[in-house]
Amino acid sequence: MRILGLDVGTKTVGVAISDEMGWTAQGLETIKINEERGQFGFDRISELVKQYDVDKIVVGLPKNMNGTIGPRGEACQQFAENLRELLQLDVVMWDERLSTMAAERLLISADVSRKKRKQVIDKMAAVVILQGFLDSK
């Protein structure tokens, strides 16, 4: 049973995958998207679901610090609903508050250059989201 983790932004979707036992999350890739043109990366996500035999997807839900859901959170909920309908899979939302900051701290502590951090931050945020979900089980 593999689980895909997604950090959905306005320009990219960070992707992480669990191991087969569902214990650890590894960064996979970052998919470029364009919301204005209706390009959400669903084709690539579908390919990854087939390639890795995924049976569940975890989508990060950005909440405000007071727990409310703003416009970005609503967009992520719609993204998740579209995935659920398209792929006929279990798609769950996971509170992603501070996941990007946690990913940034991990990369800084690993002495990753600013340029390289910018390239992998979304993928690492997806890892933080997915690992949080896996650890809760």
UniProtKB/Swiss-Prot annotation:
It comes from the Bacteria. GO terms for molecular function: nuclease activity. It is found in: Cytoplasm. The keyword Nuclease applies. InterPro entries: RNaseH-like_sf, YqgF, YqgF/RNaseH-like_dom, YqgF/RNaseH-like_dom_sf. Pfam families: RuvX. Its EC number is 3.1.-.-. GO terms for cellular component: cytosol. Could be a nuclease involved in processing of the 5'-end of pre-16S rRNA. Belongs to the YqgF nuclease family. This is Putative pre-16S rRNA nuclease.
